[in-house]
Amino acid sequence: MNSIEFPLLDRTTQISVISTTSNDLSNWSRLSSLWPLLYGTSCCFIEFASLIGSRFDFDRYGLVPRSSPRQADLILTAGTVTMKMAPSLVRLYEQMPEPKYVIAMGACTITGGMFSTDSYSTVRGVDKLIPVDVYLPGCPPKPEAVIDAITKLRKKISREIYEDRIRSQPGKRCFTTNHKFNIERTTHTGNYDQELLYQSPSTSKIPPETFFKYKRSVSSNELVN
């Protein structure tokens, strides 16, 4: 899985020398020992938990899960991110030391998913909060897809230059875009009093005369059914 190509050594000579740069050596050490911070909020994180078992064994990639952002260089977000959780996620990312990377796992993390439809509290894409290096679509993604995302991140690390990455980091990021709440016309079915069921928000109690009027309009057979 290591994408860095090493030169072949001459076995005929007793002394062999490998020439490289400090940047390549740093990239090789970082891609071989990624320490992820697991930020799972929904069902996608269960698929990532499968990698810990012996079937996939993600330890062979040098991944060591950490519980502190100050000891992690990779944060893996999985699940829905709400507006109330957004400041906490940004704070965790800011506490991670440089260089740091982000993998967005699942449709809810990348676009908000089905929970972002006419929702005022769901962030439509975690990339509006923190910069994302690898997008992993799926609902939920399979463990094999998670391994492929980690492999792509390792290849990206092997080709990057640290100084260029620092300069390319955005200075400010917004929390989210303005959400559009579309009020659709509801479809009512059945025989019931609309005034009883759909009252104004200021009405906290049902008047007794309205309640008994509705009760008399419904027969006993309908109440049993």
Curated annotation (Swiss-Prot):
Family label: Belongs to the complex I 20 kDa subunit family.
Its taxonomic placement starts with: Eukaryota, Viridiplantae, Streptophyta, Embryophyta, Tracheophyta
- Per its record, what are the GO molecular function terms? 4 iron, 4 sulfur cluster binding; iron ion binding; NADH dehydrogenase (ubiquinone) activity; quinone binding
Location comes to: Plastid, Chloroplast thylakoid membrane
Q: Which organism is it from?
A: Manihot esculenta
Catalysed reaction equations from the record: a plastoquinone + NADH + (n+1) H(+)(in) = a plastoquinol + NAD(+) + n H(+)(out); a plastoquinone + NADPH + (n+1) H(+)(in) = a plastoquinol + NADP(+) + n H(+)(out)
Query: What name does the UniProt record give this protein?
Result: NAD(P)H-quinone oxidoreductase subunit K, chloroplastic
EC number(s) given by UniProt: 7.1.1.-
For this protein, the record's SUPFAM superfamilies field holds: HydA/Nqo6-like (SSF56770)
Question: Keyword set for this entry?
Answer: 4Fe-4S, Chloroplast, Iron, Iron-sulfur, Membrane, Metal-binding, NAD, NADP, Plastid, Plastoquinone, Quinone, Thylakoid, Translocase, Transport
Q: How does it sit in the membrane?
A: Peripheral membrane protein
Identify the main location.
plastid
Q: How does it assemble?
A: NDH is composed of at least 16 different subunits, 5 of which are encoded in the nucleus.
Q: How is the cofactor bound?
A: Binds 1 [4Fe-4S] cluster.
Please list the residues that bind [4Fe-4S] cluster: C43, C44, C108, C139
Cofactor(s) for this UniProt protein: [4Fe-4S] cluster
Q: Which PROSITE patterns match?
A: COMPLEX1_20K
Role of this protein: NDH shuttles electrons from NAD(P)H:plastoquinone, via FMN and iron-sulfur (Fe-S) centers, to quinones in the photosynthetic chain and possibly in a chloroplast respiratory chain. The immediate electron acceptor for the enzyme in this species is believed to be plastoquinone. Couples the redox reaction to proton translocation, and thus conserves the redox energy in a proton gradient.
Q: Which NCBIfam families match?
A: nuoB_fam, PRK06411.1
